[in-house]
Amino acid sequence: MSQGVEFNRLMLDMRAMQMDAMSQPKSAAVAEVSGSSFADMLGQAVNKVNDTQQASNQLSSAFEIGKSGVDLTDVMISSQKASVSFQALTQVRNKLVQAYQDIMQMPV
């Protein structure tokens, strides 16, 4: 659950950064950003989804070979967490692609 919470926290941080950027007045000089960049945050989110999927696969494999202490409910919950996090990442990707296409179609 904490990985899903971390992903949600990253999404909220990105939204807050977007709102801050939109509320600041436009200036001619470019200021250095001291926080993490969007690319870093997106990379962290992708890595967390990857970690969730790997943990789910390991738990599934452990259950399949009959390792003691691995419960079917844990396997199913882990599998659903991995599925939901991947679907969320796919939606983020789709929104990024759509935003890129919208920008590219803007008249100059």
From Swiss-Prot:
Its main location: other. InterPro entries: FliE. The keyword Phosphoprotein does not apply. It is found in: Bacterial flagellum basal body. Pfam families: FliE (PF02049). Belongs to the FliE family. This is Flagellar hook-basal body complex protein FliE. The gene is fliE.
